[in-house]
Regions:
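Acidic/hydrophobic-patterned starts of short beta strands in beta-sheet-rich repeat architectures
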Residues: 1, 46-56, 110-120
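Short loop/turn segments immediately following beta-strands, especially the blade-tip
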Residues: 5-15, 74-80, 140-148
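Beta-propeller fold detector
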Residues: 12-24, 80-89, 148-158
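Repeat-based blade/solenoid architectures
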Residues: 23-40, 91-104, 156-172
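Acidic, divalent-cation-chelating loop motifs in proteins
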Residues: 41-47, 105-111, 173-174
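Short glycine/acidic-enriched loop and turn motifs that connect beta-strands
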Residues: 58-61, 122-126
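A detector of repeated loop/turn-to-beta-strand junctions in beta-rich toroidal repeat architectures
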Residues: 64-68, 131-135
Length: 174
């Protein structure tokens, strides 16, 4: 993310950029998203001061997890000072597997309580040739069928991703 600063003396049509921060905000943790970051200047914590949200603005080739970066503004609306608070704002208390997630409700441990399997198209990863790694996560229902409470059991149910090594896995039963 690049911040461009203009001089404060010119009229909008005649103003020029006088400095830039190519690792914005360089005084904190720079907002370094792989492709086409979108920024939002909104009061996210209801303290009356606008904060900064940075997230991917692309439907592909971008991170699926930790993809909503929340920077709290410790300055003011006219002189913001943004400091990273977390990289998974609004995602931290959810089951987040990224794009094209596919859930399947099934009793995986034969306790008569329905559990959860969730797959995805693939998690974005620049280090692998096709840039995506698909897997199935499993969640045991430690509550009841009427009031489910899901506890994550495995990030790769039955080690399927290493056996199949493909994208767009879909959990099914027959």
């Amino acid at each position: 993310l690049v911040a461009l600063y203009n001089d404060s003396t010119g009229v909008n049509l005649n103003t020029s950029f006088i400095s830039q921060d190519t690792l914005f905000p360089s005084y904190s943790v720079p907002a370094d998203l792989h492709l086409f970051p979108a920024t939002f200047y909104e009061d996210m914590d209801h303290d009356g001061i606008k904060d900064l949200i940075v997230s991917p603005n692309s439907s592909s080739e971008s991170a699926d997890k930790e993809s909503i970066w929340f920077y709290k503004n410790f300055g003011g609306n006219n002189s913001p000072q943004f400091y990273l608070q977390n990289k998974n704002f609004l995602q931290e208390n959810t089951i987040e597997l990224g794009r094209e997630s596919k859930p399947l409700i099934v009793d995986i441990n034969n306790d008569q309580i329905l559990d959860l399997l969730v797959s995805n198209f693939g998690e974005f990863d620049l280090s692998i040739p096709i840039h995506y790694n698909s897997y199935i996560e499993s969640y045991e229902n430690v509550g009841t069928n009427e009031n489910p409470i899901f506890k994550k059991i495995s990030s790769d149910f039955q080690n399927i991703s290493s056996q199949i090594n493909d994208i767009n896995l879909v959990p099914t039963l027959g």
